[in-house]
Regions:
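Structural signature of the urease/amidohydrolase superfamily beta/alpha-barrel
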Residues: 52-53
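Catalytic core of pol beta-like nucleotidyltransferases
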Residues: 1-36, 41-48, 57-112
Length: 112
């Protein structure tokens, strides 16, 4: 039962967690847009949910998606207060792929 309460408390703070990610993206100097997608954007979170964050980057950012994901999460945790065990999933896409996806999903834009 403790895990359920702990996880729900984390999930209720999803806006702060996403803000930490957006601030990390900004502090890394990335020209990127950040959106919340999935259950949080559609208002259907459950105790087993994670928070899906879409980061739309330029093709010229010069870093692969796995390395970029690592850099963003590390910066968000080390400098912007994202808990290390927060249930967040980063989806890194180039802008042209994002444009197609954004047309079909409910999204919440996030500003740093």
């Amino acid at each position: 039962m403790f895990w359920v309460r702990y996880h729900l408390r984390h999930l209720k703070a999803w806006r702060e967690a996403v803000k930490a990610v957006a601030n990390a993206v900004k502090s890394l100097g990335l020209d990127a847009d950040v959106y919340v997608i999935g259950g949080a954007a559609e208002r259907r979170l459950t105790v087993l949910s994670d928070i899906d964050v879409l980061v739309c980057v330029d093709e010229s950012c010069g870093v692969g998606p796995w390395e970029l994901r690592r850099r963003i999460l590390t910066r968000a945790m080390d400098e912007h207060g994202l808990p290390w065990d927060y249930p967040i999933e980063l989806h890194i896409l180039v802008r042209r792929e994002c444009e197609k996806l954004l047309k079909s999903l409910k999204v919440i834009p996030v500003k740093a």
